[in-house]
């Protein structure tokens, strides 16, 4: 056990602040301190914890001592059970749970029996929040994500014709989303078009489209290689025809693309849906990056999502939630907007965003 439970001394506030009960949080993750050389996965969980501690420091003037205790699961159910037998564990108001289903189940049962909130931010497909009132599911479940993205896109398609682009003999990996969107369009009597191309989209494949139209192109695949086979043809056709209004709609995976792919996404005024997004040039991002570098002497891993920012945003939500039941927080990378899943159930994070890559390298992030 790595103990970080010493309460941070609150800063002297500008105005009197009512002293609140201490907040105590257990962070239970596979830090793998038993390994001579920690794996990349273990290093990412350590980065998450470091970001979480920056959030603790940012909130230390709230009038309540904040206690954080880190427990290393070492990837073992036994270690989780061992932590629960520690009498000091009873002081915790909330648990940040690990990414293992068996370990989460043990902690969720403990939370239910002891009225302790269990925050699950790593197991996206876990469903324990549906039957356990103590579980807070940190990600919008996939089925609800597709529905929410589809409904939001339907509003944007009111004055645009959707054009679905697929490849002959190939199955796109977004068949479920595309099928749901087509069904919604059909139910509302909206027309859409299908274009199936052989190997690569050419401008000639689009010449049947009236040039005075307004089109939203929607690939049936999220793969970068497939996107690169589509965008140049759309750009060429648009530039030749001059008059059509053209935009592109896509998927969370696209937020990771860089180089020429990203340039073309900006060119085509691309919008994607995603549970999270980091605007690297935003002042808030720069501020956290600077604090992380100052505190720990290195930078966060260049990954998607960035675990240090996930830890920071998680702390910035969880601590105010424990203090005064704040149910929302729009973070640097991850937002938290919790809603109950029903009677006798826990809650889940309803946050979903549209990320718009506009011409001129402009990026806009808006909550759906």
Name what the model sees in each region.
Residues 26-27, 90-100, 119-122, 161-168, ...:
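Periplasmic-binding protein-like
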Residues 77-93, 204-212:
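Short, well-structured alpha-helical segments in soluble
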Residues 231-308:
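Extracellular/periplasmic periplasmic-binding protein-like sensory domains
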Residues 45-68:
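Signal peptide-proximal N-terminal region
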Residues 298-308, 312-367:
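Segments of small-molecule ligand-sensing domains
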Residues 96-166, 170-178:
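Extracytoplasmic ligand/sensor domains, especially the bilobed periplasmic-binding protein
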Residues 1-23:
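Sec-dependent signal peptide cleavage junction
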Residues 36-50, 171-175:
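Glycine- and acidic-residue-enriched helix-capping/strand-helix junction motifs
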């Amino acid at each position: 056990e790595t103990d970080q439970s010493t309460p941070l001394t609150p800063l002297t506030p500008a105005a009197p602040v009512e002293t609140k009960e201490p907040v105590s949080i257990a962070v239970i993750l596979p830090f793998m301190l038993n390994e001579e050389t920690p794996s990349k996965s273990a290093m990412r969980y350590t980065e998450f914890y470091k970001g979480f501690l920056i959030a603790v420091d940012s909130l230390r003037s709230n009038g309540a001592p904040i206690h954080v205790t880190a427990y290393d699961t070492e990837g073992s159910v036994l270690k989780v059970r061992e932590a629960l037998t520690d009498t000091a564990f009873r002081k915790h108001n909330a648990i940040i749970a690990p990414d293992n289903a068996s370990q989460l189940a043990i902690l969720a049962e403990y939370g239910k029996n002891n009225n302790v909130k269990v925050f699950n931010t790593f197991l996206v497909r876990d469903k324990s929040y549906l039957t356990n009132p103590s579980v807070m599911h940190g990600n919008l479940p996939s089925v609800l994500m597709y529905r929410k993205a589809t409904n939001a896109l339907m509003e944007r398609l009111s004055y645009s014709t959707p054009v679905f682009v697929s490849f002959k003999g190939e199955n796109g990996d977004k068949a479920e989303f595309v099928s749901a969107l087509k069904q919604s369009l059909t139910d509302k009597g909206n027309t859409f078009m299908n274009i199936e191309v052989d190997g690569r989209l050419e401008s000639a494949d689009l010449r049947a489209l009236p040039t005075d139209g307004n089109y939203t192109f929607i690939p049936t695949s999220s793969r970068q290689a497939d996107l690169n086979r589509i965008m140049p043809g759309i750009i060429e056709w648009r530039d030749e025809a001059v008059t059509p209004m053209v935009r592109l709609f896509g998927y969370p995976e696209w937020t990771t693309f860089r180089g020429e792919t990203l340039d073309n996404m900006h060119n085509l005024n691309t919008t994607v849906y995603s549970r999270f997004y980091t605007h690297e040039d935003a002042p808030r991002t720069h501020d956290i990056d600077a604090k992380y570098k100052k505190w720990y002497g290195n930078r966060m891993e260049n990954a998607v999502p960035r675990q240090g920012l996930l830890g920071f945003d998680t702390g910035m939500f969880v601590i105010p939630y424990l203090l005064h039941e704040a149910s929302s927080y729009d973070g640097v990378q991850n937002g938290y907007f919790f809603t109950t899943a029903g009677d006798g159930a826990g809650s889940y994070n309803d946050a979903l965003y549209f990320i718009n890559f506009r011409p001129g390298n402009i990026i806009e992030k808006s909550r759906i």
